[in-house]
């Protein structure tokens, strides 16, 4: 073999080695991802089962808080359809207990409003319930002022609604000078006005509630923010998630030490994830220590998301995934 032939032979061998090297790199990436998936699955998402879609059939029962015409009622219809079997309960806690007892397959709860912020106490209830967030829905909130047939805007003295409803319409209410009375639910206020038949009373609720309870809309869309929207979550006893889910909600506790939250946020930033919400809640019996509830855009099928969750778990206390949806 002359010198030129030997050079060509070496170049061919080098190219074969480069090709083989790239194949091994690709395999290592896949194996590394699989190892990470296995690690996080055993340590953090133990028990979670991926599904193609949530099971919903003619026997499925959904529970919501309030009465027909409430925004939770509307969110239920939006997510499950109008033909879904349903029950309604008086309190948010009752939604959780109804699902835990097996009397309902899914529960609907409001979690956050774009104008008034988080709905107080919901994350605490969900985090300690053992239930899983398996879905979510956003409902455009168009509050109406409604009274009994024949009443006029000038007759109104007292307005009933959920505290969030009153807060979201505070500018209109304060200008008008009405007495404001909180009730358990926006639609509950509509029921009260209908039942008492007093022309000086009005409710703030949805157009659906006005239609259901035969009330007249005295003034429409009275919210402070025309883009007012409420985010709802869907709860289940089953620890499952739809494979196409793109949001993950987690909770964890942090000690009262410098840099602890910064460290958590660093793991999110390092993995290129977007945090869409965060709420802190004081820990009972632990002065100046807090639990945090955060929602990330991510997937349990994604190595970057898995890496972030793994590190958050290691750097926090009582870490728990409360849902991916």
Kindly label every feature range from the protein language model.
Residues 1-325:
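Domain-level signature for soluble enzymes in the chorismate/prephenate branch of the shikimate pathway
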């Amino acid at each position: 073999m002359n010198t030129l032939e030997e050079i060509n032979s070496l170049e061919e061998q080098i190219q074969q080695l480069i090709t083989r090297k790239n194949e091994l790199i690709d395999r290592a990436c896949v194996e590394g991802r699989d190892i990470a998936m296995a690690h996080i699955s055993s340590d953090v998402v133990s028990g979670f089962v991926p599904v193609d879609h949530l099971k919903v059939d003619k026997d499925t029962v959904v529970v919501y808080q309030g009465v027909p015409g409430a925004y939770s009622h509307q969110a239920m219809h939006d997510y499950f359809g109008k033909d879904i079997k349903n029950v309604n309960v008086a309190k948010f806690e009752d939604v959780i207990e109804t699902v835990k007892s097996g009397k309902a397959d899914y529960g609907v709860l409001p979690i956050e409003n774009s104008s008034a912020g988080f709905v107080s106490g919901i994350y605490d209830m969900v985090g300690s319930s053992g239930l899983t967030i398996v879905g979510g829905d956003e409902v455009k909130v168009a509050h109406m002022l409604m009274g009994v047939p024949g009443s006029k805007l000038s007759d109104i003295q007292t307005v009933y609604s959920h505290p969030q409803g009153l807060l979201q319409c505070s500018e209109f209410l304060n200008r008008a000078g009405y007495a404001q009375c909180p009730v358990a639910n926006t639609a509950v206020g509509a029921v009260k006005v209908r039942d008492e038949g007093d022309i000086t009373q009005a409710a703030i609720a949805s157009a659906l509630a006005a239609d259901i309870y035969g009330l007249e809309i005295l003034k429409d869309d009275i919210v402070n923010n025309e883009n007012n929207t409420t985010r709802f979550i869907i709860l289940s006893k089953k620890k499952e998630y739809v494979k196409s889910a793109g949001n993950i909600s987690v909770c964890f506790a942090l000690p009262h030490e410098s840099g602890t939250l910064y460290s958590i946020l660093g793991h999110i930033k390092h993995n290129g994830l977007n945090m869409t919400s965060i709420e802190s809640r004081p820990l009972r019996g632990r002065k100046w220590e807090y639990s945090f509830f955060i929602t990330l855009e991510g997937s349990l099928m994604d190595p970057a998301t898995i890496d972030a969750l793994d590190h958050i778990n290691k750097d926090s206390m009582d870490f728990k995934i409360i849902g991916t949806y």
